[in-house]
Design a protein with these regions (language model features):
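Active-site-proximal loop/turn and secondary-structure-junction residues that shape catalytic pockets
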Residues: 15-17, 58-62, 96-100, 133-137, ...
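N-terminal pre-domain/capping segments
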Residues: 1-48, 123-126, 229-246
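Histidine-acidic metal/acid-base catalytic patches
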Residues: 50-52, 82, 111-128, 137-246
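Conserved, mostly hydrophobic/aromatic
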Residues: 2, 35, 46, 113, ...
Length: 246
């Protein structure tokens, strides 16, 4: 079906961990191994459908044992990267999530993300980072603070929205509401800025076609088709502004 559709596809393994509670930086070795086995099954599926990339996320952690969790994450990531390489040429990405709002993942703030990416890239040149506009406010960073330090490691860019002003607001946290959702953080202006920074750091350089994708979902009884149209209009208007400015 994908071949007939003339589409490129990447495999998101994040739900494999989020829906099961498995954690690849689990300090319990049995738990870490279960998470790894789950992701390896995902790698096999990804190759089966001809995916060009495979993405996952880090797990929750205890602040008092943060360094141990980091070491466990590095160990797991290297195992996944080696497994992927043993099967073919698929790229591997870790998606950067919030560390204290919703997913509460280890990776994370830009300084730790950079340290992590450097460590993995030493041995695995097919590894990179997936950044997400919707997660940047949740990490309490600006676009520049989040992207500039890791510019050399970005291999996938998500565009999305979030609500974080108050925990009792609809769609609070990492819920990916449509652009312009009440009390949300991102709309056309923020997408414009995100695209401009991606251009400045060379991710969108006009020479290659890197992955840029949306992550949005309906809230409540919203019509999915209308939310998809919302995302397309947002990107079209934002890109038109970027082109005018350049």
């Amino acid at each position: 079906m994908l071949e007939t559709s003339h589409m490129a596809v990447a495999y998101g393994a994040q739900p494999r961990l989020l829906t099961t509670g498995l954690n690849i930086n689990d300090l319990n070795e049995e738990g870490r191994q279960k998470a790894l086995a789950n992701l390896k099954e995902g790698v096999d599926e990804a190759y089966e459908v001809g995916a060009s990339g495979f993405a996952f996320l880090s797990g929750k952690y205890e602040e008092s044992r943060k360094e141990e969790a980091f070491e466990a994450l590095v160990k797991s990531t290297k195992e996944i990267c080696s497994y992927v390489k043993s099967k073919g040429n698929m790229k591997v990405s870790l998606e950067v999530f919030d560390f204290d709002v919703d997913k509460k993942s280890l990776i994370g703030p830009a300084d730790l993300t950079l340290r992590y990416a450097k460590e993995i890239r030493k041995d695995h040149d097919h590894f990179g980072l997936m950044v997400d506009l919707s997660h940047i406010p949740l990490i309490h960073e600006t676009v520049e603070e989040s992207l500039l330090p890791v510019r050399d490691y970005i291999t996938h860019a998500h565009i999305g929205n979030c609500v974080m002003k108050a925990a009792d607001m609809p769609a609070y946290g990492d819920a990916h509401p449509r652009f312009g959702f009440p009390n949300s953080e991102n709309d056309v202006d923020q997408v414009v800025h995100y695209l401009e920074v991606l251009m400045q750091i060379g991710y969108l350089d006009g020479k290659k076609r890197p992955i840029v994708s949306f992550e949005v979902k309906p809230f409540g009884d919203e019509d999915p088709d209308i939310d998809i149209a919302n995302a397309k209009r947002t990107l079209n208007e934002a890109w038109a502004r970027v082109e005018l400015a350049n």
